[in-house]
Amino acid sequence: MYLFSELSLIPLILLLALWAFGGWLILARFELPAHERGLLGLGLGLTLAALLANLTARFLPTSLAFWLAGILTLLIGVVLARPHKLPITNFQLPITQWFAFALLAFFLTLIGRGLGIFDDYQNLTQLSSMALGDIPPHFVYDPRILWSYHYFLLLVAAQFTRLAEAPPWAAMDLARGLTLALTLFYGAFLARRLTGSRVAAALSAGFLFFVGGARWILLLLPASLLNRISASVALIGSGADSGSSLQAVLYNHWKIQGLGPFPFPFLYGSGLDPSLTMAHAGYGASMFMLVLMVMLLAGKGKGWIQQAILAVLLAALALANEVTFAFLYAGLIFAVLVWVIRHRTFKLPASLWAFAPAVIGGGIIALLQGGVFTGLLLGIFGQVGGSETSEALYKVSFALRLPTVLSAHVGTLSLLNPLHWFVILAETGLAVFVLPWAFRRGWKLIREEKWLEAAWVFSMIPSLLTIFLEYTGNAGPTALSRMTAHFLMVLKFYAVPLLWLWAKEKSETLQIALLGWGLAAALSGIGLFSLQIPAMPNPIYAEFIAPIDAKMYQEHWGRLQPGALVFDISPQRGPTVLGLHTQSGIHYGPPTYPEWYELADNPDPFAMNRAGFRYLYLELSYWRKFADHFDDSCVVKLDDMQETASDGRVTAQRVLLDVGQCR
């Protein structure tokens, strides 16, 4: 199939084998059910190799660094398993489970290949340069700025790009598909542990995947009430692009880029809690995969090995999604406070202190490894020392406000306005009704002193408290919606197993009602997923990448001067194709630097060289307009690729110039 034509299969299989076998050997020190160990080993190996790659790539060429990370993962597993009886003699391979996992990962990857939605303009540019050695990454649109962002999944994808020769657009989809499939299986493992039922495990995985917002329930309201509600809200973002009012947009298509053959109905979306069927952003489902691994492994190992593995997973979580990491740590604080209040003593139990090395170690690594927390730390050092030589891209700040829920589509929804309650329920979805069962589970976990899982449950508290905050940083106000939506993901982890146990001895009528509730909660996700399936046979690159760009990528990626800047009238295209940075602004999207516009409107090879650009990546219309500006002998034409129609007419063209000698 076409996916295999986009990458080298043997290096990919070898890389996955290093991760899986290394992680499997490490887990010899953990008491795990046989059916869990293989896939947990793959996830652990993937995670450990990513963090090792994040370290080794700072000193070595990425090809060597990435292979070394995989080999080190295997060697660590061999060393840790050696003092015990090697588990080879007890080797069990649940073939059916592995086949189902591989099929699911492949299926999800194919869907991703047919879609280009959510931040590809941001992630593919960064991924392309990371695969060539920009680790820790710098902002692709101005490399003077540190890219203080959650780039764990991009690290995984960068290994696919460099070692398996997958172009960024395929590597990103493969990384998302792989980690999402692991997330769903881990969710099933958790449910099976709680219920002992394979049926509950399968239902829980489906619930985790499909459940999200339930905006369609607004259509159940009387038209007069819906009209009043619509008049009380102001759409923002893609919501405003999709319609003039809430009442009107419910009948419209959702206007977002990168869709497949069929548009998405707006009523199936959510600006607060989209289902995992829409996990096409730069972090995918990687943070949930890591949280589930922490929960499944905590308490299953002993001594320093367990602490080291948990510290690695927690550090990776910080690099995957800083919000999830911060809320997990805050949840641990809330869980401890509940324990202190319950026992009326500040003398904390030994079971809590036993996890201190992992929690503290993960936090220290998070501050040093790169990403958001490293950016915050460098920002503090810069303020104290009066220097901003390592300026971070994102600034974090908050202000207090009256209780409000922020939807990335519907805007601000006040809890003081009863009309907004209907919209809040529609944006959060029906999983919110599991809240009492989840807190009851948290109380039980505290009694049992299962601290890291209790931390996950009580991480709902800081998430819920964000209704009193307004995000005033420079990542956009809707960054707050991810924080508020966090508690809903906690609920989705537990909804099926907790309700399964509660309803097991109840009447069939209640059980059928719960099944109906689950189907209603999953309706939007099922609808969106069904519209994504037709995209599978039609792979795309990205909204800004054409087939001719993919050919230029094959010819020139990784073959130009490292660290050089590229100029392209489409700032995201040149960096993705060539793996280089540009210098166009401090935001994604249209350039913000006036000097960039001056060069674009009046190109001169000498001025471009003085501005720091060595390479120019030019499209057909721009080349036709300004070709005579590049007649100087100092300009070297590295490539002039054209596509022609049957009548000989040029339909697409890319010209790659080197102006490094224009001084």
What does each model-found stretch correspond to?
Residues 87-95, 297-306, 341-353, 434-461, ...:
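Membrane-interface helix-loop-helix junctions at transmembrane boundaries of multi-pass membrane enzymes
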Residues 177-180, 326-332, 475-504:
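Hydrophobic/aromatic-rich transmembrane helices and adjacent perimembrane loops
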Residues 60-110, 198-205, 356, 663:
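Start-transfer (signal-anchor) and selected internal transmembrane alpha helices
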Residues 1-85:
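Membrane-embedded, hydrophobic transmembrane alpha-helices
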Residues 503-663:
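Extracytoplasmic
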Residues 272-273, 294, 306-322:
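Membrane-interface alpha helices of multi-pass inner-membrane proteins
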Residues 288-298, 331-332, 336-343, 356, ...:
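Hydrophobic, aromatic-rich transmembrane alpha-helices
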Residues 102-287, 539-543:
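Active-site lumenal/periplasmic loops and adjacent helix-entry segments of GT-C-fold
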